[in-house]
Amino acid sequence: MSTDADVVVLGATPAGIAAALAAARHGKSVILLERSAHPGGLPANGLGATDIKTRGTVGGLFLKFTRLIRRHYEETYGPESAQLQLSSDGYRFEPSVAEDVLCGMLREAPLVSLRTMRQFDSSPENLEMENGAIITIRVLDRMTGAVESYRARRFIDATYEGDLAAAAGVPYRLGREGADEHGEPMAGRFYAAWFGEEGSGALFERRESWKTRHNTRPRTE
């Protein structure tokens, strides 16, 4: 079986779902392929909390996701419920709730076709390239055992391991290069001082965190 679309996204991780929704917003037909039966990546498979403390920086599709999570707990258990409080304004959730919310977001995008149980094995023989670009990939339907071909103008690798990129011959390395190789003096350092808006329920204390990590005071100007 061969199927065509403007965009094929490999991996229904949060990044893959966001990419699919963004492409659909621009009027592109999208096929979203997921290896497992449960789209949503880590949040839908056990990682029930986000570690974003600087919630004033959150926007876009992720902000919509947190608001839908919050609405679920408020409508299901009530505005004064412990469940709503424990959801930390939508930043903490049960994996099943995360999956339901993400699938609901996909259902709102008719140009996106989600296909689960589609396995891409990271091998050059499972794709076709033309002028250095992928034009076709082949995946296994894990339910039927059939091999399916997907053609698209653009392919997006949203797997956690970079399976599609590796199969296409994109250079990669294991580990991390030195900061001098690309002139990145800040690489590998985590700067904890945040002077923007704090999210409700966040445990982040910018001054104390700065003192602990740097044994100094943050700038106040």
Language model features with spans:
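Beta1/beta-strand and adjacent pyrophosphate-binding region of the FAD-binding site
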Residues: 1-13
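Active-site-proximal beta-strand/loop segments in catalytic clefts of secreted hydrolases
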Residues: 10-13, 33-36, 46-47, 118-119, ...
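N-terminal Rossmann-fold NAD(P) dinucleotide-binding loop
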Residues: 16
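Glycine-rich FAD pyrophosphate-binding loop
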Residues: 24-45
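Aromatic-residue-lined binding/catalytic grooves and analogous aromatic/hydrophobic interfacial grooves
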Residues: 52-221
